[in-house]
Amino acid sequence: MNTVILPRVGVGVDVHPFAAGRPCWVACLEWPGETGLAGHSDGDVAAHAACDALLTASCLGDLGRVFGTDRPEYAGASGAVLLAETARLLGAAGWAIGNVSVQVIGNRPRMAGRREDAQKAMSVALGASVSLSATTTDGLGLTGRGEGLAAIATALVIRA
């Protein structure tokens, strides 16, 4: 085992199907007029992928283990709450967050016009820098067919 303290990197992925009648929360922002996402919490794929990447990088588990459906206190929880709790858990375990990069994958909502607001909302909730991008799958897969939304995130953590 290497005794040199190095940064650690984690990857997180989250996918949720669209669900009529639910508000749409993505990247800690509500998207009025958009169909929401199904899920135990608010279905915020960007926040969930970021949490998963951070938990993985710090060896604290994954999204399902920490905030899973067996945890009723997180039913309906916002992505911002999950990000803040993830940051708290990492800090308690001796980790500092370097940054998080998130890519939202899907046809809607269109992120471009609110990307900076989304980055700020996620960064404030996490207490660390978050960058955000978005892409489509050119009609391929569940996101291309408009069945849901996905996100992938990469996180860098260092020993505090």
Swiss-Prot record:
<dbReference type="GO" id="GO:0016114">
    <property type="term" value="P:terpenoid biosynthetic process"/>
</dbReference>
<feature type="binding site">
    <location>
        <begin position="135"/>
        <end position="138"/>
    </location>
    <ligand>
        <name>4-CDP-2-C-methyl-D-erythritol 2-phosphate</name>
    </ligand>
</feature>
<protein>
    <recommendedName>
        <fullName>2-C-methyl-D-erythritol 2,4-cyclodiphosphate synthase</fullName>
        <ecNumber>4.6.1.12</ecNumber>
    </recommendedName>
</protein>
<comment type="pathway">
    <text>Isoprenoid biosynthesis; isopentenyl diphosphate biosynthesis via DXP pathway; isopentenyl diphosphate from 1-deoxy-D-xylulose 5-phosphate: step 4/6.</text>
</comment>
<feature type="binding site">
    <location>
        <begin position="40"/>
        <end position="41"/>
    </location>
    <ligand>
        <name>4-CDP-2-C-methyl-D-erythritol 2-phosphate</name>
    </ligand>
</feature>
<dbReference type="Pfam" id="PF02542">
    <property type="entry name" value="YgbB"/>
</dbReference>
<feature type="site" description="Transition state stabilizer">
    <location>
        <position position="136"/>
    </location>
</feature>
<dbReference type="GO" id="GO:0008685">
    <property type="term" value="F:2-C-methyl-D-erythritol 2,4-cyclodiphosphate synthase activity"/>
</dbReference>
<dbReference type="GO" id="GO:0046872">
    <property type="term" value="F:metal ion binding"/>
</dbReference>
<dbReference type="InterPro" id="IPR036571">
    <property type="entry name" value="MECDP_synthase_sf"/>
</dbReference>
<dbReference type="GO" id="GO:0019288">
    <property type="term" value="P:isopentenyl diphosphate biosynthetic process, methylerythritol 4-phosphate pathway"/>
</dbReference>
<feature type="binding site">
    <location>
        <position position="145"/>
    </location>
    <ligand>
        <name>4-CDP-2-C-methyl-D-erythritol 2-phosphate</name>
    </ligand>
</feature>
<keyword id="KW-0479">Metal-binding</keyword>
<comment type="function">
    <text>Involved in the biosynthesis of isopentenyl diphosphate (IPP) and dimethylallyl diphosphate (DMAPP), two major building blocks of isoprenoid compounds. Catalyzes the conversion of 4-diphosphocytidyl-2-C-methyl-D-erythritol 2-phosphate (CDP-ME2P) to 2-C-methyl-D-erythritol 2,4-cyclodiphosphate (ME-CPP) with a corresponding release of cytidine 5-monophosphate (CMP).</text>
</comment>
<feature type="binding site">
    <location>
        <position position="16"/>
    </location>
    <ligand>
        <name>a divalent metal cation</name>
    </ligand>
</feature>
<feature type="site" description="Transition state stabilizer">
    <location>
        <position position="40"/>
    </location>
</feature>
<feature type="binding site">
    <location>
        <begin position="62"/>
        <end position="64"/>
    </location>
    <ligand>
        <name>4-CDP-2-C-methyl-D-erythritol 2-phosphate</name>
    </ligand>
</feature>
<keyword id="KW-0456">Lyase</keyword>
<feature type="binding site">
    <location>
        <position position="14"/>
    </location>
    <ligand>
        <name>a divalent metal cation</name>
    </ligand>
</feature>
<feature type="binding site">
    <location>
        <position position="48"/>
    </location>
    <ligand>
        <name>a divalent metal cation</name>
    </ligand>
</feature>
<comment type="subunit">
    <text>Homotrimer.</text>
</comment>
<feature type="binding site">
    <location>
        <begin position="14"/>
        <end position="16"/>
    </location>
    <ligand>
        <name>4-CDP-2-C-methyl-D-erythritol 2-phosphate</name>
    </ligand>
</feature>
<keyword id="KW-0414">Isoprene biosynthesis</keyword>
<dbReference type="InterPro" id="IPR003526">
    <property type="entry name" value="MECDP_synthase"/>
</dbReference>
<comment type="similarity">
    <text>Belongs to the IspF family.</text>
</comment>
